[in-house]
Amino acid sequence: IQLEKMALVNMSSHFHYLRRVSDTGLEDATVTLCGTETSKNYVVDTDASAKKDNSIITGNKYADHFNFPLGHVDGDGKWSIGATARNQWFTAKIADVLNAEEDNPEWTGDGDYHIWRYVTENAVPGETQQKNGLTTGIVFRGKMTATADTPASLKDALENAEGTASDAILYSYSNNLYVTWKEVREFALKEGVGSGFYKAVFGTPENVPVIETDAVDAVYSDDVQSPDYLWNKWHNESMDDAARQAAFKNAATGSNFTIYQSSKEDDSVGYYCYYFYWNRHNDNGNDGVMGPMEFAVVRNNVYKLAVTKINRLGHPRNSDDDPDPL
């Protein structure tokens, strides 16, 4: 994965000119103007009550409260991350950020930080209210690239992508990446009937699925709920049917497949994935439990972030292709 771009999302569009703190994060009897933030209280935001009662999320009112909202709400009220949402983000090339002013010009070693931009205050009242749609974050866009160890079929797909519907669709399952559904079927059949991979692909068919060869026609699962059955109905019988495609994607992601499709971005063509980081303000040291003001942006703070390693593929371009969407 080659990280190419980074984007700021969910930056507050309103904020108090003077900091306020309270025990609850709300404008209640405990609020103190110009008060000191502690490990147990909260900075009070202008829209604290709307964040507390969840009305920003339930009412899809993100654009009323944030610049660069993470997701887009369509005419049917569906929130998702796709091309329209990404056009809302504040996006920069990572190379430009790394060429920006150094945080410590006197530093002569490796790995110095560079200044990106100012971000307005964004605090959320309560631990459980700290959600993806409300907290300020950074999104990294990565491009899949081939290495010397990349299998031939995957290397061909990555290096010859045109960003059209004719490009191979990649499927990730259990940390393995497959090129085309035919390859998924082939490996699932090798795993055998009792395997979880077999069931994820074929469901519980009454027939015996068969892989296509030069001498044998493919036999697809007759389990009408399985991804294999629905892929055949879409891809082989009605490729232009959006409803059939959606049904297949829903079944595939429901079986924990992540779907990656090529695209033409503004400056290149390829297969892209996305990594999300939520700005951590008051780290409680427990990754499994959120603490007060853990995910927030507070004035007069400098937040530093370093990407040192990538361990897995990121989220796909579109929410409908993601078994674990934000």
Description of each model-found segment:
Residues 2-299:
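Tryptophan-paired
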